[in-house]
Amino acid sequence: MVKLTKAKTFQAYLDSCHRRYSCVHCRAHLANHDDLISKSFQGSQGRAYLFNSVVNVGCGPAEERLLLTGLHAVADIYCENCHTTLGWKYEQAFELSQKYKEGKYIIELSHMIKDNGWD
């Protein structure tokens, strides 16, 4: 009989010489400041940032949502370490002017902190 076990997820660590953002709940690294696209976004619980790429983040199933800027297919994202929902990933934008968001990530400010090198 073969016993199946859940595989351990290994946490990614971002370079310590760069400014980065971490999960406020568990301090897992989430994104480098260099991957920040915009600070002018609104999440479901307040202000949010748009990032080009993230680490230590899992993605739920995509669903269509009517957001402030129109209809989008989005998937909730969560911290792979503590499983807190952080924001969402834009899978598809239905309006031409919003296509730049596809494949990008929203993280709400209430779920992240500035970490390392923010003097």
Swiss-Prot record:
Residues 19-116 form the Yippee domain. May be involved in proliferation and apoptosis in myeloid precursor cells. It comes from the Eukaryota. The gene is ypel3. Keywords: Apoptosis, Metal-binding, Nucleus, Zinc. Belongs to the yippee family. One of its GO terms (cellular component) is nucleolus. GO terms for biological process: apoptotic process. One of its GO terms (molecular function) is metal ion binding. It is found in: Nucleus, Nucleolus. Zn(2+) binds at C23, C26, C79, C82. Pfam families: Yippee-Mis18 (PF03226). InterPro entries: Yippee (IPR034751), Yippee/Mis18/Cereblon (IPR004910), Yippee_fam (IPR039058). This is Protein yippee-like 3.
